[in-house]
Amino acid sequence: MSTCTFVDKKGTICGRNNLTGSEHCHLKSHYDTEIEYKMAISNVMEEFKEGRIPANQFLQSNVEADGACLFRSVANAIFHICGNDLETLFERFEASEYYQMLPKAVKDGFLLEYRKLFENFSDPDKFLDDEIETEVAIILQKMAVRYTLAKSSVDVTETMEGIGDIFGPSCTLQTFIETTHEITLDEYVSLYEKFAGEDDYYLKEKEVVIRRGHKRGKQVVKKVKVDIQERWGGLPELLMYAEMFDISFNVYIPQRLDNRTMKPVIAKKVCENTFYYLVQQINQNKGTNVVNLSLKEVKEGPHYEFLRPV
């Protein structure tokens, strides 16, 4: 990339990278005329828009950032997909490999549980209310654990773009889970039985000795917090849901142009100048249904949102 040749009063050459199609950088004072500057900015904006989707083409689900955001987002996505044709969805699920692999003794009960996902759904053009969203998210997390138990040895390199570049020509679901979450498969199954939206600790009774005051030396029982690992959902879980529900996932990050540098940056808030940039595809061109998700960093950590087309 060429650099800005503007020379200041001291004879110092700017040297910053030029804007696309321009002979100067992002600083307005380095242009001979305001028209030249505006044209340069316009060119940068047009280049930025290429390959990105305007944020106003989606509505964001605005799920809670409580560790269960992926499960909540997928719950809203399934709600949107199923529309009012629930019977077709149930028929497809009964015929799916996921349902067929379940032990015969649990099939009927599991189908009832699956139906519970949708029993209160009414308007697919709205997002789920908080209570139903949580119920569905809990079931979805349990489904991921069951899928893991049955399909841990399955090769997943063809389901998600880029896995082969990291793990080589072959990668099992177990390897993908253990590498992503940095725990063993047994630890994953045990840990993810507890809903991700619940507290990341439990209270344990502990005997302690009072060291100060008039009760000094007396032994009492107190409740203390014991931390447990977070149970967030990520790419392994998206891969599972892609197979379960016949979905192709597109994961986007929200971006905007920085007003100072005119370079793309992550947008903390979605506004009219926000665009979505595709960073990951799962089950590309294979799923009957396409689901778009947003991924951004918030105070609590990485955060997923379902993006419903307007």
List PLM regions with ranges.
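Structured beta-strand/turn binding interfaces of compact recognition modules in eukaryotic regulators
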Residues: V7, N17, K28, D66, ...
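Intrinsically disordered, low-complexity regulatory regions of eukaryotic proteins
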Residues: M1-E50
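A recognition module on extended beta-rich or small alphabeta surfaces enriched in W/G with H and D/E
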Residues: E272-V310
